[in-house]
From Swiss-Prot:
Places the protein is found: Cytoplasm
Residues at which S-adenosyl-L-methionine binds: A33, G34, H35, D53, F79, D100, Q107
Pfam families in the cross-refs: Methyltransf_5
Protein name: Ribosomal RNA small subunit methyltransferase H
Species in which this protein is naturally found: Clostridium tetani (strain Massachusetts / E88)
EC category name: transferase
Amino acid sequence: MEFKHISVLLDECIEGLNIKENGIYVDCTLGGAGHSSEILKNLSKEGKLIGIDQDEEALKAASEKLKEYENVLYKHSNFYHIKDILEELEVGKVDGILMDLGVSSYQLDEKSRGFSYMQNAPLDMRMNKKSSLDAYEVVNFYDESKLARIIKDYGEERFAKRISNFIVESRENKKIETTGELVDIIKRAIPAKFRREGPHPAKRTFQAIRIEVNGELEILNKAIEDSVKSLKSGGRIAIITFHSLEDRIVKNKFKELEDPCICPKDFPICTCGKEPLVKIITRKPIDPSKEEVEINPRSRSAKLRIAEKL
């Protein structure tokens, strides 16, 4: 199996991580190992890379791609568990951590995974195939109000109520089994005028269901906090996001870690004792260049934010 994936903001990530040749680095979303491969090129044999992915197929493909390197440790897990993983591996503090929060090109293109609204496939969307919750469960068994909330909150979809209503009405006759069936329902729910404008009409709903299935936003907050605690002083964390919800979480969490003081604004001095943990390197997120977007259109919505441990 070939795990096809074009790494997004590759040069910007490598530069942003400020790699030390003998350092220890963690790729929390190993995927096609594009970023990891570049990190390893910048490491000596004393340096080390830890690659984490919850997708076993991604791990297998990455280990094949990186087989010439002996300084790589692979871990089948979710980066939610980064603190436990590093304790288990007894590596202590690390010099850099990377998170690429996008669905890989392989996962989008592999029909059986059910991530794409462009191909007909079973409703799945699990990053980790061993997870019990899948898209079929969400679409067919969540009640209408819960579905509407997920589509509105996670997909930022203005027609969330109509879409959830159409889904519930459709499944009363027959369970919704494929991505193609779901796309047709979404298209019927969205007024024609709005279907013709902007991105694919199913994009936001599919994003929302994927986030729910994989618990992506709940995981992210804790993972950033634990990652920063796992960094050495001067170590950096670089995070690539692909939609505004994720970017907002990263932006706000970095701000909170840079200025954690909870004292009232009119207090002359801080008495809460909460000290800054990071310095934000990217006041504004780094976007892909026009050239990168032309080569890889999927990079269009990517944003990179970087912070350094104090």
